[in-house]
């Protein structure tokens, strides 16, 4: 008869799962599907649990004797349990020195085990409170970050407004308004018969050329102003 196969307590290497989820397997539909959701019961650390179990089960439902009353102060009970563990540990050391093979050694070990179970149970009852406090702290951090972001944005906005005001204050007084310089009035065409006269057409061309020269001069002034603003630190 062959030797029994040794089973490792550790999970298998993840590589044997990773190699199943290649791009080719996913495209061809050969990748393993995820396990279905558990509906009834499951095993964890060698114990069976139900999906509808309470997050913190009462001690009585686990077959454990309750050492503290139903209504109690968690801090006081934890201090009492801590002191009881210390005293029982010293008693266990005394038993191991005087009579290591005594039955009292097993009894004291069971007492210590029961005390530690109660300590862990009382600590676990603080988990919902811990979750609420963690959520509260996280929301406070997010609120503070948003307020700091809004404050920085407000400072940048005030700085931009100040820069614009300084630029406007540094403009020369003789600079024409940009609105008057950039806007070209659309004059209606004269449909009178006299508009076909050569002399009148020449006069219109001269006036339009004069206006064009004025617009070019204003555009050049604006370009110089923009270049000066860009050269400033």
From Swiss-Prot:
**Quaternary structure, from the entry:** Component of the Mediator complex, which is composed of MED1, MED4, MED6, MED7, MED8, MED9, MED10, MED11, MED12, MED13, MED13L, MED14, MED15, MED16, MED17, MED18, MED19, MED20, MED21, MED22, MED23, MED24, MED25, MED26, MED27, MED29, MED30, MED31, CCNC, CDK8 and CDC2L6/CDK11. The MED12, MED13, CCNC and CDK8 subunits form a distinct module termed the CDK8 module. Mediator containing the CDK8 module is less active than Mediator lacking this module in supporting transcriptional activation.
Pfam assignment, any one: Med7
Its taxonomic placement starts with: Eukaryota, Metazoa, Chordata, Craniata, Vertebrata
GO BP terms, alphabetized: positive regulation of transcription elongation by RNA polymerase II; positive regulation of transcription initiation by RNA polymerase II; protein ubiquitination; regulation of transcription by RNA polymerase II; RNA polymerase II preinitiation complex assembly; somatic stem cell population maintenance
- Identify the PANTHER family for this entry: MEDIATOR OF RNA POLYMERASE II TRANSCRIPTION SUBUNIT 7, T-CELL IMMUNOGLOBULIN AND MUCIN DOMAIN CONTAINING TIM
Record-linked SUPFAM superfamilies: Mediator hinge subcomplex-like (SSF140718)
Principal localization reads nucleus
User: Could you tell me what this protein does?
Assistant: Component of the Mediator complex, a coactivator involved in the regulated transcription of nearly all RNA polymerase II-dependent genes. Mediator functions as a bridge to convey information from gene-specific regulatory proteins to the basal RNA polymerase II transcription machinery. Mediator is recruited to promoters by direct interactions with regulatory proteins and serves as a scaffold for the assembly of a functional preinitiation complex with RNA polymerase II and the general transcription factors.
- Compositionally biased residues, Basic and acidic residues: 203-214
| Similarity-based family | Belongs to the Mediator complex subunit 7 family.
**InterPro entries in the record, alphabetically?**
Immune_Mod/Transcr_Coactivator (IPR051669), Med7/Med21-like (IPR037212), Mediatior_Med7 (IPR009244), Mediatior_Med7_sf (IPR044888)
Which Gene3D superfamilies does the UniProt entry name for this protein? 6.10.140.200
Q: Does the keyword Cell division apply?
A: no
Cross-link annotation Glycyl lysine isopeptide (Lys-Gly) (interchain with G-Cter in SUMO2), location: 185
Protein name in the entry:
Mediator of RNA polymerase II transcription subunit 7
Phosphoserine carried by residues? 195
Q: What's the encoding gene here?
A: Med7
Organism this protein belongs to: Mus musculus
Question: Which terms are listed as keywords in the entry?
Answer: Activator, Isopeptide bond, Nucleus, Phosphoprotein, Transcription, Transcription regulation, Ubl conjugation
UniProt region (Disordered), positions on chain = 187-214
